[in-house]
Amino acid sequence: MAISETDTEFRSSDGAVIVNKSTGGTHFSTDGKLAVSIVANARRDGTSHVSIYGDAQGLLALADLLTAFASLDQESVSDKNCPNGEGVHTSLTSSTGLASSSITLNLGRLDAKGTHDQNWFLHHDAVSIVPLENAE
């Protein structure tokens, strides 16, 4: 999926708005269902894991968002929308399309724009993660 950038938004190749720059919101829209949870010590060996479950539409919407992030040329994104040293990223929450029982799911590029640092997110201030909005 190719991503195009205009002065006001990022759009996918099918014309769907992914990021509206005027509101700062990433749009995650699905008619399906998607739930994310952490299961701690499920196997009694002290390990935890993340579970992501959804119906077909919910999983396809997540796949589209992941594909959009993977396909995006971060180097061409304006510094206002993705500063040097950060990767494109966002958060999905229960108020933006996940099931009400879900935890927040942070998604983003591991490679930072400009520096290609793969540990940028470890030092990132979580307050600056772009909030999501439901697509109209």
Language-model-detected regions and their locations in the chain:
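Positively charged, low-complexity terminal tracts
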Residues: 1-136
